[in-house]
A protein has these predicted regions:
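NAD(P)+-binding Rossmann beta1-loop-alpha1 motif at the extreme N-terminus of oxidoreductases
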Residues: 1-55, 98
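NAD(P)-dependent Rossmann-like dehydrogenase/reductase catalytic/cofactor-binding core
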Residues: 2-3, 31, 163-166, 197, ...
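Internal alpha-helical scaffold of NAD(P)-dependent oxidoreductase catalytic cores
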Residues: 31, 141-174, 185-217
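Structural/interface elements that position substrates and couple domains in central-metabolism enzymes
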Residues: 36, 180, 184-188
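Rossmann-like NAD(P)-binding element
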Residues: 40-44, 56-103, 110-111
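Rossmann-fold dinucleotide-binding core
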Residues: 103-181
């Protein structure tokens, strides 16, 4: 039973039953929202339904292979498919045809919602809705205003996310990567460059981050920290260090070399670090336990 206010959202369809889609489904269903989960692959859908239903016992989660049937009665459609612009644009067009009045949301982590909805009817009823992995644990959801997104659509997205127990934040300009991923990949760019330029090895980069800035970021964000230490000191440090920090507008040659060589990280057994059998699962469990502990202690 719905308790509280979901704004104009009374039913939800989630398109894409992969890791993100199935867990988003569990979160929304756990809040009591009637929900349909759809995926074109029946085997994937069956697995996802079992996982989502385990997250929300007793709640109504339906499965549907046909996209139009899944979204036709939904007030909110959340797209959680592969990170491919053409695929997302095609899905949005099909969803809009089947659900002309629905609020369409993309879980893209980097693609601007305005690019996905270019030329789409009812673009005022679209938002970016970037959930972080794992979506059932990370509180923040970035709600991105596209070029044509209405204030009503932003408010509706906010209301339903708050109802589901999430912490939505407003991203008022539709830039690639939004807020979190722009910050994250600025750090990754410099981390990879430190390795590529021989300043230190990969293990040292991770050890330094985990035992310095990583310890305090959950308690004090970068803007508050700049204020905390003093903006005069921040300016002096920037004047010294920024000229030597990597500012490339293209991906690292070392990163490209590793991908070309099939060194893809945990999935291939070798990336910047070696990965043995079971080490990825162990890392995932360690990460989930750490996030859960951080949230419990907030």
């Amino acid at each position: 039973m719905l308790k509280g206010s979901t704004g104009s959202i009374r039913s939800v369809a989630i398109v894409g039953a992969g890791l993100m889609g199935r867990r988003i489904a569990g979160v929304m269903a756990r809040a009591g929202l009637p929900l349909v989960l759809t995926d074109s692959q029946p085997v994937v859908l069956d697995s996802a339904l079992a996982e989502a239903r385990a997250m929300a016992p007793g709640e109504r989660i339906l499965g549907e292979v046909d996209l139009a049937s899944a979204v036709v009665d939904a007030d909110l459609v959340i797209e959680a498919i592969v990170e491919d612009l053409d695929a997302k644009r095609g899905l949005f067009a099909a969803a809009r045809a089947a659900a002309p009045e629905a609020l369409l949301a993309s879980n893209s982590s980097v693609i601007p919602i305005s690019r996905i909805t270019e030329g789409l009817a009812g673009a005022d009823r679209t938002v970016g809705m970037h959930w972080w992995n794992p979506p059932d644990l990370i509180p923040i959801v970035e709600v991105i205003r596209g070029e044509h997104t209405s204030t009503e659509s932003m408010d509706a997205a906010f209301a339903v996310l708050e109802f589901a127990g999430k912490v939505p934040v407003r991203v008022q300009r539709d830039v690639p990567g939004f807020v979190g991923n722009r910050l994250q990949h600025a750090l990754w760019r410099e981390a990879i460059d430190l390795v590529a330029s021989g300043v230190c090895d990969a293990e040292t980069v991770d050890r330094v981050v985990r035992n310095t800035i990583g310890l305090r970021l959950a308690a004090m964000g970068p803007i508050e920290n700049a204020d905390y230490v003093g903006l005069d000191l921040t300016l002096a440090i920037h004047d010294q260090v920024l000229p030597s920090i990597n500012s490339d507008r293209h991906s690292s040659p070392l990163l490209r070399q590793k991908v070309a060589a099939g060194q893809l990280g945990a999935k291939s057994g070798q990336g910047f670090l070696p990965w043995s059998d079971g080490s990825r699962d162990a890392a995932a469990a360690r990460l989930a336990a750490h996030i859960a502990e951080q949230i419990k202690n907030q």
